[in-house]
Amino acid sequence: MCNVYSKGFIKSGMLDENGREAFSEITSETKNKIDVHRSKNEIALIVTKNNRVIYGLESLLAIIGNSFPTLEKIARIKPFHWFFQRLYKFVSYNRKQIIPSEKDLTKDNCVPDFNLKYRLFYLAFVLLFSAYVLGFYNQRLFPNFKNNFGLEFFICCMQILWQSAFMGIYLKDRIWDYLGNMMTVSLLGTLLLIPALFFNFSQVFYFIYFGIVVFIMFLEHLRRCRILKFGIIPTISWMLFRITFGAILLYIVSNS
């Protein structure tokens, strides 16, 4: 994920083309200048004029401030700075769950420390956001059914509990990495559903589109499990949950 915004800074001219160095490729000279462990949690910026090193949000503000000094001043106002500091940590501690990499399992990886608080915040954020959007989407699938948010919230909670129960035994100490990636798959599916809510298509269309989105989520779930070497079992369990609770949902709706 660091690559995403560092490349963005380069393309926008806020950072020199040679001003970026991938964590897995840093030289011994750079390692001697920075706190390697800290830089896994907070991106490091070396100010070449005086060899001063700044980390995390401060490094981003320094880069932005070179091109947009007013934005930097606004971001440093206490309430805003407090918010952006938490937002930075929220993204940083969960960035490998948002965009995983095969390099995450290598020796010279840049995987941040595990922070339970921010991982739980991430799971809760995706859970609430997904339940909210799916509540609206369910109205397109089942126009006569009420309490869509409550039902979707329950299903999203059950998905976490289901996978935690089964995968906790299989993945053991890697369960939190899996849950973060699983919820990112849910977030992807939720985002794909949103555009369809701005139009009024037929009920059949919404069922077909929902099926397409679930298939995309299935492929993404497989891809992430392959990258992180979780194996096929998490995907099988994930699909069993979808099928089981999909059948339960249809039963509830048809008898409501």
Language-model region placement:
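Thiol/selenol-based redox catalytic cores and closely related redox-interacting motifs
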Residues: T30-R140, L191, P195-F205, Y209-L228
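Local sequence-structure signature of Cys/Sec-based thiol-disulfide redox active-site neighborhoods
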Residues: M1-E17
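Alpha-helical transmembrane segments forming the membrane-embedded cores
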Residues: G135-M239
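Final/C-terminal transmembrane alpha-helix of multipass membrane proteins
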Residues: I233-S256
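Thiol-based oxidoreductase modules, predominantly thioredoxin-like and allied folds used
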Residues: M14-K31, K40
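Hydrophobic core of alpha-helical transmembrane segments in multi-pass integral membrane proteins
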Residues: A124-V133, I160-S164, G246-A247
